[in-house]
Amino acid sequence: MTAHPETPRLGYIGLGNQGAPMAKRLLDWPGGLTVFDVRVEAMAPFVEGGATAAASVSDVAEADIISITVFDDAQVSSVITADNGLATHAKPGTIVAIHSTIADTTAVDLAEKLKPQGIHIVDAPVSGGAAAAAKGELAVMVGADDEAFQRIKEPFSRWASLLIHAGEPGAGTRMKLARNMLTFVSYAAAAEAQRLAEACGLDLVALGKVVRHSDSFTGGAGAIMFRNTTAPMEPADPLRPLLEHTRGLGEKDLSLALALGEVVSVDLPLAQLALQRLAAGLGVPHPDTEPAKET
């Protein structure tokens, strides 16, 4: 195992809307914090809080665990592999954690490229937004080797209350992309529901209040995400009665919504697709002798 200090020095690159509240949670880290942002004014509050402002990315390379929260793959690659980037100056054993949402192949490629130098590339995208970061309640999905994951757990726990070791480098990003896919598909579904409600002359703001209120109790889509496989359930699975009940309710309500859409002349393609795929998606597909309900 690579030798490393008992209390590592931390570095943070990128102090924007997401990075700033995360880095702020590290100001009292006993090993110290070095920050860098291309905007000098973004670093000023951190210097006032006791952090060291770096003059360039290369100065941050002196840290032992370095977090990066920049915009996209190109910026991530530039910070790490440019002529004056982290890869040129970081010592063996350094952990570079990428919190930006990037392509999974970017993390894999960087990890392979820097492995001979003894530099650990960790993809650690977060979920929860700036508000959760400020409270230390982010979820972080980590793609890392076992050694690196153990080393980042304590500092990352300053800004995250849920740390998931998703697997090797690239796995954290894959989990984040699946999570974000659910978010944005649900946004599209929300827009479809609003079109139906609007065509029925309903108050859309009131509908939003109902959705937020009920989701705070039911948990939204996450409420059915407890299985460790998407394969059809075994007959004796203890969750089967619950999900068969959910299937029945879902197919009934989706059928009613689609029928209402026909009455008010609103196309509901996501609802139609949901009706077709709900049973199999829940792991309780209809037997061949029991076709799914259709409108």
Swiss-Prot record:
The active site is at K176. Its EC number is 1.1.-.-. NAD(+) binds at residues 11-25, 101, 252. One of its GO terms (molecular function) is oxidoreductase activity. Gene3D superfamilies: N-(1-d-carboxylethyl)-l-norvaline Dehydrogenase, domain 2 (1.10.1040.10), NAD(P)-binding Rossmann-like Domain (3.40.50.720). Pfam families: NAD_binding_11, NAD_binding_2. The keyword Oxidoreductase applies. It is an enzyme of class 1 (oxidoreductase). One of its GO terms (biological process) is organic acid catabolic process. Keywords: NAD, Oxidoreductase. Belongs to the HIBADH-related family. This is Uncharacterized oxidoreductase MT0794. The lineage of its organism: Bacteria, Bacillati, Actinomycetota, Actinomycetes, Mycobacteriales.
